[in-house]
């Protein structure tokens, strides 16, 4: 995974990615009727606060001899953006969305306890000695529908539990609308519900034929943008921030990514020039750091599963069949053989004592 994403860095330095190929044109769903469905009836009002503009950071590529461009890994990060404290860069730092969701989770549990609310019929299936229940989502092949639900729920908690209303003009939908129809000012005073965020993201992923892995990388870029640019995602900017993160993630993850003009066919009223400008600003605010280590990706995947469990978004479980058990065993054996080959190669380079006995490992048996 890291190899593909590092290779994609070379494509992103100019703010626009050269295309390696182009897939068939996306479908054109009736999108406009869904995106701006009013949420005033059920949404919670939020007091508007003046937006504080944040100037994009100056980029210094350190031109040296022969106009050598400094690699992203060689540049020093600012002290306030230390990797150890940034969850989108460091695998040990806690994800922002999970910490923002804990307040609501604790309040919900406390309310259920005080009101003696019964959890009702258990829907989650547990394994026993005779039956093993597994879902169809793995870290390498997540379930698309469930992953989009989890990612949009994480975005929902980002908006609901934001610290302020700091934003940038390039992401402000009032300055750069996604539709020609005039959106009432009241629309921007209410937090969007989870179902509206899900509908917006699902429409883009369905029309552009994006994968579940792309959704996870989208969330990584979104949190990285909020941290680097020191802004908040709020009712006035969430659509353009999410759109920019999806646009960038699709180009990094997929060699035959959707073109900017294809997104214009999905959103219809947005121009290619606006998409290009937003992409350029997004990359500059990320300081062109589009690298997503495998450890960071895995952390976001498992934290999304924890978020789903806390909010009763259960994955679809099914009994382990004999055919799937054989497939899992074959995959495990292949990985084990590769690991043994690496160990042997390392031992050949490092052994200096005679009669060295390697570590014995027991074989796992699936029955």
From Swiss-Prot:
UniProt keyword Disulfide bond, yes or no: no
Sequence positions bearing Phosphoserine: 73, 111, 118, 352
UniProt keywords, alphabetically: Cell membrane, Cyclin, Differentiation, Membrane, Neurogenesis, Phosphoprotein, Spermatogenesis, Wnt signaling pathway
Cellular compartments annotated: Cell membrane
Main localization category: membrane
The family this protein is said to belong to: Belongs to the cyclin family. Cyclin Y subfamily.
Residue span(s) of domain Cyclin N-terminal: 186-291
A family per Pfam: Cyclin_N
Protein function: Key regulator of Wnt signaling implicated in various biological processes including male fertility, embryonic neurogenesis and cortex development. Activates the cyclin-dependent kinase CDK16, and promotes sperm maturation.
Subunit details: Interacts with CDK16; this interaction mutually increases the stability of CDK16 and CCNYL1 and increases the kinase activity of CDK16.
GO MF annotation: an example: protein kinase binding
This protein's name: Cyclin-Y-like protein 1
Reported consequences of knocking out the gene: Deficient male mice are sterile, due to severe sperm structural and motility defects. CCNY and CCNYL1 double mutant mice undergo embryonic lethality beginning at embryonic day 14.5. At embryonic day 13.5, embryo display substantial neurogenesis defects including a thinner cerebral cortex and a reduced number of basal progenitors and postmitotic neurons.
Organism from which the protein derives: Mus musculus
Cellular compartments per GO CC: membrane; plasma membrane
Keyword Phosphoprotein attached: yes
GO terms of biological process kind: flagellated sperm motility; neurogenesis; regulation of canonical Wnt signaling pathway; spermatogenesis; Wnt signaling pathway
Expression across tissues: Highly expressed in the testis. Largely restricted to germ cells in the testis.
Residues of the signal peptide: none
